[in-house]
A protein has these predicted regions:
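PLD/PLD-like phosphodiesterase catalytic module centered on the HKD motif
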Residues: 1-161
Length: 161
């Protein structure tokens, strides 16, 4: 059965950076999926030690047509051996904006989903809301939730083209 926690950064004593580090510290994940509208190098550096360990099983989707995401951040993710998809909507009037992190194992998964981008401010300083979902993949609805998330992000016909 799912365990759900609410996080309101900068109003409480909980921070997205800490929760993301916890997610990335579970070394038995078979897959890590990240999606952010904006990524800056300082955001990558704040979780780089944990991400490096899981880089070979990590895929990140990063919005690029937004005047915020930096080439240095994308380069750093690539240096860590993370598979990166740069998502360009083709217009400035629509930006790629989903923010979530998924760690998926054989029997469980953790999802961090909310408003925080992968910038230092987004992970540490801004007032950001999020939910931490700890899922049991033996529960059909929870497995379907994870499978749908992974399929939606990795289906070449939807985002990654």
């Amino acid at each position: 059965m799912a365990k759900l926690d609410f996080l309101l950064q900068a109003v409480t004593d909980r921070f997205h950076a800490d929760e993301l580090r916890k997610l990335l510290s579970q070394q038995d994940w078979k897959r890590v999926l990240g999606s952010v509208a904006f990524v800056l190098k300082d955001g990558v550096e704040s979780v780089a030690p944990q991400l490096k360990v899981l880089a070979k099983v990590s895929t990140f989707f990063v919005g690029i047509r937004n005047d915020i995401t930096s080439m240095q951040a994308i380069k750093r993710l690539l240096e860590l051996d993370v598979q990166v998809y740069a998502v360009d909507t083709g217009t400035r009037s629509i930006i790629f904006h989903p923010k979530l992190f998924l760690g998926e194992g054989k029997s469980d998964a953790t999802v961090l989903i909310g408003s925080a981008n992968m910038t230092f401010s987004g992970l540490h300083n801004n007032v950001e809301a999020g939910a931490i979902l700890k899922l049991d993949l033996a529960v059909a609805d929870e497995k379907r939730f994870v499978d749908d998330m992974v399929k939606t992000f990795t289906d070449q016909s939807s985002i990654a083209q």
